[in-house]
Amino acid sequence: MAYVKAPIPSEVYHLTQKDKLDDILDDGKIRRFGDTECWFCESLEKMKAYMERTVLCEGKAYYGVGGQLCHYPKFEPDKHIILKLTPCRREGNWYRWNQEIPLNSPPELVQAAAEFSKLKIGYRGDLAFKDVEMIDMEAFLRGEIVCRRMQEPEQTTHMDEMTL
């Protein structure tokens, strides 16, 4: 895998399952579990594009941690949430993984790999955060941003009204 250092972001977005939310909030960090990094997107626009190429592609094959061949299950929006996070530490543990492709690949594949690589960044270690907003997945997939800070009322914005 080709890792390159990435600039330190001021905020990131993380897709997770709703049933993990309480543990995440109690810990105050996103844990990497069996992987080297935990993965994030730098904008909601990138998150949507990432999801369209991955979790929203039911049955599509991918390689999981350790090189195991897996297939995306049916995505259940009501069981997922996007977290908007402000990282606590400003250290440079951020990396981008550049999608590997065979030598002499067609230009279309090279371009697709480069575009996919720009959609996500990884953080080496468990990411501690200080602020969190929750973005409703079902609304997000309809093109709306329903966002709630902890202990604040929901705010709704249409995606075309936001600067992503």
Q: What does each model-identified segment do?
A:
Residues 58-164:
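Active-site and NAD+-binding cores of ADP-ribose-processing enzymes
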Residues 18, 44-47, 88-91:
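Short, charged/polar surface micro-motifs in flexible loops or helix N-caps
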Residues 44-61:
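Short active-site loop/helix that positions an aromatic residue
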